[in-house]
Design a protein with these regions (language model features):
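Ribonuclease/tRNase effector modules and their secretory precursors
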Residues: 1-95
């Protein structure tokens, strides 16, 4: 089984700026949160990347990654309204 890896500094930056971490993504993946895996939309600029679409607390996040022989390197985490609507039917009302 491959393991997940990421940049520790980037993880802290994501925690501060976006309120989410790679650990939360991994937790969601291990508990059935994977919605899809797609090719990176910009294949010319990122030919070796794919994108995980992950459900975290009823919101879809895009997680670009590079797959090596022994590990999967997570690049960043991008919240996506468009993918939330496509895969989860929109943002859930908290009332």
């Amino acid at each position: 089984m491959k393991y997940f890896d990421w940049n520790v500094g980037k993880n802290e930056e994501l925690r501060i700026e976006r309120g989410i971490t790679f650990e939360e993504i991994i937790f969601s993946l291990l508990h059935g949160g994977l919605l899809d895996t797609i090719e990176h939309p910009n294949r010319k600029k990122y030919p070796d990347q794919k994108v995980l679409i992950v459900n975290v607390e009823d919101y879809a996040y895009l997680v670009p990654f590079v797959e090596a022989e022994e590990y999967i390197f997570l690049k960043t985490i991008i919240p996506s309204r468009r993918m939330t609507k496509k895969y989860l039917g929109g943002i859930k009302d908290e009332t």
